[in-house]
């Protein structure tokens, strides 16, 4: 019998290290370790991580859900990164590049990096894969995990489906094997590395619009129209970037869009609701109490659309509300007042 050589600080084989101990990172770590696999969860605040270890739970974000025995809580980045070949980065998009720079010195020669971050690079609107290549070079295999997932439901073991994409087919297969749980968590393989990243950013913006519409009181018809036309905008931008159209009909496109636009577990939707009810941007964000990815994503997607010459009227109106002080009701009226168009355009 061949014994696996273990060379890490924990003295046992680590299936995966999750970088980021917010609600989503913690829920993924719980799900990954639920079947007995050893998983390291790293967070950058030692006091927060000490509390997670003492409680063996994340009471702030995931109340009532205990950590499996095989989930290891860690605040030492070097130990966490070197513990496993495979890293899953789950941090807000505006610190994605910073976190990659922080972990880079500790990477192993065989490290592979996947991220579940949804968004684009701040101030540039670049895809996160381009940020990762800039920071890490082309030596390491990269992948993206995306789809319709709320952290509380995932952590509670409720049925969930998601997709993973990478230029490295073996990395995709290995991630499917590690993440997939036949009873509660289904993972689909996808070959569209670009489209998978874009869907997660654009849907955040459209969800703010859907929330604004509902906050104003426009009803189900308007919400559905926003979702449908928002999907069209997502597809147009994806086509300009070379993404595969079918990706946007899958988990990382339509699936995530519908989830985020229709359920109040979505911070982006709740943020939009508050704006539609008359609150200003700062108050609406403060009321959420956690990062609202769609706020920054709106500027990033708007910048990307401008650079690519892609018309995205919903994104444009939401950008004007968030960054130029436009009234949400006026933005909705201006959308309806646009020149007549064919549905396919």
From Swiss-Prot:
Q: What is its main location?
A: cytoplasm
Q: Give the keywords, sorted.
A: Cytoplasm, Lipid biosynthesis, Lipid metabolism, NAD, NADP, Nucleotide-binding, Oxidoreductase, Phospholipid biosynthesis, Phospholipid metabolism
Which residues make up the binding site for sn-glycerol 3-phosphate? 118, 147, 149, 203, 256, 266-268
Q: In which pathway does it act?
A: Membrane lipid metabolism; glycerophospholipid metabolism
- Cellular component terms, GO, for this chain's entry? cytosol
In Pfam terms, one family for this protein is: NAD_Gly3P_dh_C
Q: Where do the TM regions start and end? A: none
Catalysed conversion reaction:
sn-glycerol 3-phosphate + NAD(+) = dihydroxyacetone phosphate + NADH + H(+); sn-glycerol 3-phosphate + NADP(+) = dihydroxyacetone phosphate + NADPH + H(+)
Q: What is its EC number?
A: 1.1.1.94
Positions with a binding annotation for NADPH: 23-24, 44, 118, 151, 267, 291, 293
Q: Which GO terms describe its biological process?
A: carbohydrate metabolic process; glycerol-3-phosphate biosynthetic process; glycerol-3-phosphate catabolic process; glycerophospholipid biosynthetic process
User: Where does the UniProt annotation locate this protein?
Assistant: Cytoplasm
Which InterPro entries did the record assign? Answer: 6-PGluconate_DH-like_C_sf (IPR008927), 6PGD_dom2 (IPR013328), G3P_DH_NAD-dep (IPR006168), G3P_DH_NAD-dep_C (IPR006109), G3P_DH_NAD-dep_N (IPR011128), NAD(P)-bd_dom_sf (IPR036291)
* Biological role stated in the UniProt entry: Catalyzes the reduction of the glycolytic intermediate dihydroxyacetone phosphate (DHAP) to sn-glycerol 3-phosphate (G3P), the key precursor for phospholipid synthesis.
Q: Which PANTHER family match?
A: GLYCEROL-3-PHOSPHATE DEHYDROGENASE, GLYCEROL-3-PHOSPHATE DEHYDROGENASE [NAD(+)] 2, CHLOROPLASTIC
Per its record, how is this protein called by name? Answer: Glycerol-3-phosphate dehydrogenase [NAD(P)+]
Classification of source organism: Bacteria, Pseudomonadati, Pseudomonadota, Gammaproteobacteria, Vibrionales
């Amino acid at each position: 019998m061949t014994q696996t050589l273990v060379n890490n600080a924990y003295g046992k084989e680590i299936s995966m290290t999750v970088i980021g101990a917010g609600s989503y990172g913690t829920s993924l770590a719980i799900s990954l370790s639920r079947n007995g696999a050893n998983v390291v969860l790293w967070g950058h605040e030692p006091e927060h991580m000490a509390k997670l270890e003492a409680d063996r739970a994340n009471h702030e974000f995931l109340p009532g859900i205990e950590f499996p025995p095989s989930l290891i809580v860690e605040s030492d980045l070097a130990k966490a990164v070197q513990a496993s070949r495979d890293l899953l980065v789950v941090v807000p998009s505006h610190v994605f590049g910073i976190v990659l720079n922080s972990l880079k010195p500790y990477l192993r020669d065989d490290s592979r990096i996947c991220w579940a971050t949804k968004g684009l690079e701040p101030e540039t609107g670049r895809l996160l894969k381009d940020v990762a290549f800039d920071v890490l070079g082309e030596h390491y295999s990269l992948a993206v995990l995306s789809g319709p997932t709320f952290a509380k439901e995932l952590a509670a073991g409720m049925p969930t489906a998601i997709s993973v994409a990478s230029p490295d087919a073996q990395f995709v297969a290995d991630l499917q094997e590690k993440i997939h749980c036949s009873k509660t968590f289904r993972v689909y393989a996808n070959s569209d590395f670009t489209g998978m990243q874009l869907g997660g950013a654009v849907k955040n913006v459209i969800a703010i619009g859907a929330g604004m519409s509902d906050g104003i009181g426009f009803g189900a018809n308007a919400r559905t129209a926003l979702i449908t036309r928002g999907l069209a905008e997502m597809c147009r931008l994806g086509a300009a970037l070379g993404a595969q159209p079918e990706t946007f009909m899958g988990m990382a496109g339509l699936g995530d869009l519908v989830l985020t636009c229709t359920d109040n577990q979505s911070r982006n939707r709740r943020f939009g609701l508050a704006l539609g009810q008359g609150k200003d941007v700062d108050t609406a964000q403060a009321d959420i109490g956690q990062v609202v990815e769609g706020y920054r994503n709106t500027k990033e997607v708007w910048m990307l659309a401008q650079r690519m010459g892609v018309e995205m009227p919903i994104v444009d109106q939401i950008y004007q509300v968030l960054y130029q002080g436009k009234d949400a009701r006026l933005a909705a009226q201006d959308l309806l007042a646009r020149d007549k168009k064919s549905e396919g355009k």
